[in-house]
Amino acid sequence: MGDPKLPRRMWRKPKRPFNYDLKMEELRTLGTFGLRTKRELWKAHTELSRVRNQARSLLALGQEVRERKEPVLLRSLARIGLVGKDASLDDVLNLQVNDLLGRRLQTIVMKKLGFSTPYQARQAVVHGHITISDRVVTIPSYTVYVEEEGDIKLTGGSAFATILEKSKRAEAAAREAAAEAAEAEQAAAQAAAPTPAPAAAAPKQ
């Protein structure tokens, strides 16, 4: 059972921690999702492994028991947006760690509210600028339920509202400037193109 004061570790290190390709892949994932340490990534891998093991265990059961237990697992995963309503155990086995990391509050806040980087979104979450159904959530790794996505917003009077508005205006101005530069470049290229010589008249017979 173990001592309740000393809970079990929630993550496992990779079997080949010094593999170069693995380390590079981990660093890319950390940057993509704004993770603070590799431990956050290892927790996601451990949770994904647990879910896959549940799916494999169900595949090994008899038909009657499987039909009773399989919908329970699929419904729980559908609630957090990992699989669709019509998913099967094969879809569960095909899940990747990026799918799980994509359901973190930090990731969804970045996409939904328009933060420029995942680290900026993490800062907003940690400092209490994000609410879900009028409830302040300060945990970047919080797994967002599908029905909660529409209730994610900035707290009233948050300084990030001004920051995001300025960022959106700057991005719009940059896109407009890039479009104007492309049009000017295209016009200059057309003006510099040599004019084709007129076709010579056919000799008279």
Swiss-Prot record:
PROSITE patterns: S4
Span of domain S4 RNA-binding: 103-173
Cross-referenced PANTHER family: 30S 40S RIBOSOMAL PROTEIN (PTHR11831), 40S RIBOSOMAL PROTEIN S9 (PTHR11831:SF5)
Official protein name in the record: Small ribosomal subunit protein uS4
Similarity remark: Belongs to the universal ribosomal protein uS4 family.
TM helices/strands, residue ranges: none
Highest taxon of source: Archaea
Region entry Disordered, spans: 174-205
Summary of the function given for this chain in its UniProt record: One of the primary rRNA binding proteins, it binds directly to 16S rRNA where it nucleates assembly of the body of the 30S subunit. With S5 and S12 plays an important role in translational accuracy.
UniProt xrefs under SMART domains: Ribosomal_S4, S4
Pfam families referenced in this protein's UniProt entry, alphabetically: S4
Subunit structure, interactors included: Part of the 30S ribosomal subunit. Contacts protein S5. The interaction surface between S4 and S5 is involved in control of translational fidelity.
Entry's Gene Ontology BP terms: ribosomal small subunit biogenesis; translation
CC terms in the record's Gene Ontology section: small ribosomal subunit
Alphabetical UniProt keywords: Ribonucleoprotein, Ribosomal protein, RNA-binding, rRNA-binding
Molecular function (Gene Ontology), one example: rRNA binding
InterPro entries, alphabetized: Ribosomal_uS4, Ribosomal_uS4_arc, Ribosomal_uS4_euk/arc, Ribosomal_uS4_N, S4_RNA-bd, S4_RNA-bd_sf
Bias (Low complexity) ranges: 179-205
